[in-house]
Amino acid sequence: MTKMDHKIVKTSYDGDAVSVEWDGGASAKFDNIWLRDNCHCSECYYDATKQRLLNSCSIPDDIAPIKVDSSPTKLKIVWNHEEHQSEYECRWLVIHSYNPRQIPVTEKVSGEREILAREYWTVKDMEGRLPSVDFKTVMASTDENEEPIKDWCLKIWKHGFCFIDNVPVDPQETEKLCEKLMYIRPTHYGGFWDFTSDLSKNDTAYTNIDISSHTDGTYWSDTPGLQLFHLLMHEGTGGTTSLVDAFHCAEILKKEHPESFELLTRIPVPAHSAGEEKVCIQPDIPQPIFKLDTNGELIQVRWNQSDRSTMDSWENPSEVVKFYRAIKQWHKIISDPANELFYQLRPGQCLIFDNWRCFHSRTEFTGKRRMCGAYINRDDFVSRLNLLNIGRQPVLDAI
């Protein structure tokens, strides 16, 4: 039995909060105003859209229960203002308990940790097992049968990238593939791109020079979540793509140089995109290379040597030399042949990858090369990933 399955055995009220005790012996307090704010009756909550109707600022300061009742599966309260009645499911109280928490935040969505467990990798790990899906199978997915999209999303999430085989060598079909997954994100590069190395946009991606491992969009406040490439044509040599599992590399840095890892979670790194005459994009707030969530877990790596701006806003000038030492240690790890997977893209095969996790690069090339692709927002992708792989109800239970 998990904590989510426990039943209510006792409730009490001490004036400012309601206490709930479960059959496992655990208990938690819930403030009066918090409980009133989270009433899910039809007057306070629009169930069809999962949105609050109650104006939280209208709740009186002296809000208090005049009656508290419970069953094994439900808490019932009658409030002193307008004798409003509220009910709270036992499972909901366990999931959202906060004083103290009954379950870790990372376990609020039932099954998430197990189903969406990531697999960090090295080059050796990927030998003979590159994740892939088939174009026709994915495109045949329907609202009634989304298993192919479910599988595709999970492979992208688990490994940080996925190939799509047997794609028509046609930009229009590639665009349809992107839209089958999620909405395409428009930027100053356009929505769906179709480009050659003609510098039609003043960015190194539109040249034939070597581009080292990086993530895209460090100059945006909201960096793209996914990126898809399709090499439509190449009449020449070179242009090999590489992928690096930056999350795996971050674990190495944290183990070998913990002080450098910690530094790179704090030092903000400014970035810009200013190649176009009418464009100079910079994030509202510069972000560190490693972004951690509230539990200290790594959720994003931002790394782009080309787009880094002049770093002149040091809170502690003594950290300047430490920063450069840290990124040198970091660069050594991500450039290790054991961690950098090189792959020759080819017409008819797309590559999609997690731009928050995987670095990509491209070696210098000769001849004419035509590429198409698109960005997809992370929030949109994660929403579809969760709903298809975990299920709508467990996700809704946690909001």
Swiss-Prot record:
Catalytic activity, as annotated: N(6),N(6),N(6)-trimethyl-L-lysine + 2-oxoglutarate + O2 = (3S)-3-hydroxy-N(6),N(6),N(6)-trimethyl-L-lysine + succinate + CO2
Identify the EC number(s).
Answer: 1.14.11.8
Its subcellular locations are: Cytoplasm
Q: What GO molecular function annotations does the UniProt record carry, in alphabetical order?
A: iron ion binding; trimethyllysine dioxygenase activity
Which pathway, per its entry? Amine and polyamine biosynthesis; carnitine biosynthesis
| CDD domains (UniProt xref) | CAS_like
So which domain of life are we looking at? Eukaryota
Cofactor note text: Binds 1 Fe(2+) ion per subunit.
Q: Name a single GO biological process.
A: carnitine biosynthetic process
Q: Its GO CC terms?
A: mitochondrion
Q: Which cofactor does it need?
A: Fe(2+); L-ascorbate
Protein residues bound to Fe cation: H214, D216, H360
| Location, primary (coarse class) | cytoplasm
Alphabetical UniProt keywords: Carnitine biosynthesis, Cytoplasm, Dioxygenase, Iron, Metal-binding, Oxidoreductase
Q: Name one matching Pfam family.
A: TauD
Give the matching SUPFAM superfamilies.
Answer: Clavaminate synthase-like
The entry assigns this protein to a family as follows:
Belongs to the gamma-BBH/TMLD family.
Function summary: Converts trimethyllysine (TML) into hydroxytrimethyllysine (HTML).
Q: Return the PANTHER family for the record.
A: GAMMA-BUTYROBETAINE HYDROXYLASE-RELATED, TRIMETHYLLYSINE DIOXYGENASE, MITOCHONDRIAL
Protein's name in the database: Trimethyllysine dioxygenase
Organism per entry:
Meyerozyma guilliermondii (strain ATCC 6260 / CBS 566 / DSM 6381 / JCM 1539 / NBRC 10279 / NRRL Y-324)
